[in-house]
Amino acid sequence: MSQAEFEKAAEEVKNLKTKPADAEMLFIYSHYKQATVGDVNTERPGMLDLKGKAKWDAWNELKGTSKESAMRAYVDKVEELKQKYGI
């Protein structure tokens, strides 16, 4: 898995013909954050920020996942979404 493949996938996901389902978007978001930042390094958003909490929780579930594993899962998911939604 190369950084270039990961960056290409990050650009391609922005060009999908249809917006992926919320669960798919959470997968993409959380794996991108784990690959680029690592483990969660912020406080969990407040109780009124439902979207923020969902994103934080999805990212936090990946705690301990290596950058390489997160990048691979991200690229694989983007490839799946490209087949499903088109680009």
From Swiss-Prot:
Q: Does the keyword Cytoplasm apply?
A: no
- A single Pfam family it belongs to is ACBP
GO terms, molecular function: identical protein binding; long-chain fatty acyl-CoA binding
Task: Indicate where the modification N6-acetyllysine is found in the sequence.
Answer: 8, 19, 51, 55, 77
Sites where Phosphotyrosine occurs are at 29
Q: Which ranges carry the ACB domain?
A: 2-87
> Which residues does this entry mark as bearing N6-malonyllysine?
55
N6-succinyllysine modifications at: 8, 17, 55, 77
Which parts of the sequence bind an acyl-CoA? 14, 29-33, 51, 55, 74
Which InterPro entries did the record assign?
Acyl-CoA-binding_prot_CS, Acyl-CoA-binding_protein, Acyl-CoA-binding_sf, FERM/acyl-CoA-bd_prot_sf
Residue(s) carrying N6-(2-hydroxyisobutyryl)lysine: 55
Q: Where in the cell is it found?
A: Endoplasmic reticulum; Golgi apparatus
Please describe what this protein does: Binds medium- and long-chain acyl-CoA esters with very high affinity and may function as an intracellular carrier of acyl-CoA esters. It is also able to displace diazepam from the benzodiazepine (BZD) recognition site located on the GABA type A receptor. It is therefore possible that this protein also acts as a neuropeptide to modulate the action of the GABA receptor.
Name the family: Belongs to the ACBP family.
Indicate what this protein is called per its UniProt record: Acyl-CoA-binding protein
Q: Which organism is it from?
A: Oryctolagus cuniculus
